[in-house]
């Protein structure tokens, strides 16, 4: 037996391989725990964090996601990296269906449960600590799958996309809302100043964690651009793939369908 062979993950990846964590390169098998630490740190102020990172515009982006998804009654949503339940709650408000929130971070889910407890549709929510790379749900069990501001934090994004495809019913739809790549250089320069100079300082003052906010800004720049993500979705099996830029590409919604 070869005792020196590299460890491998359930997805067949070499766990000793280096992968991006913001602008740093870290061992693949360390990233998930490092991301979990970041979100444990920011969980109590996560919604405020989104307000700071987007100047409050994330609320309009999430409305745009719901408008494009057009939820229908009795649909079942699986929201990956669902954190505090913001997307699931918006979905239920519009559809009256049900939602299953998946997140690797128990602190984020605890914040979500507390937030949802007084909502009229709290009983229609399920919460599960699990990775988007290994979703503990049956094949063809979801009508819709979403991931909002979470795919860039996933260690193996292709594995997460394939899992989203696996759990969708034929005719089901996947939507990803994520910070993306700005199309106008002038706006990009201003956004860099905000992200790398102002945001970490605000994070230190508001949440007491400058490093977490710096990582989040770096992770946005490391995320694939709009066309690259379309190609990844096609590789995972999705069809009729489209994207819409929001706020000149600061964020984008990607949509894909499982046809059979």
Which residues make up each language-model segment?
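Class I SAM-dependent methyltransferase SAM/SAH-binding core
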Residues: 76-134
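N-terminal auxiliary segments of SAM/dcSAM-dependent transferases
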Residues: 1-37
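Core SAM-dependent methyltransferase catalytic element
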Residues: 230, 236-260
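Conserved alpha-helix/loop element of class I SAM-dependent methyltransferases that forms part
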Residues: 41, 45-48, 52-76, 90
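Conserved class I S-adenosyl-L-methionine
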Residues: 173-203
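A short acidic, Gly/Pro-enriched loop at the edge of an enzyme's catalytic core
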Residues: 133-144
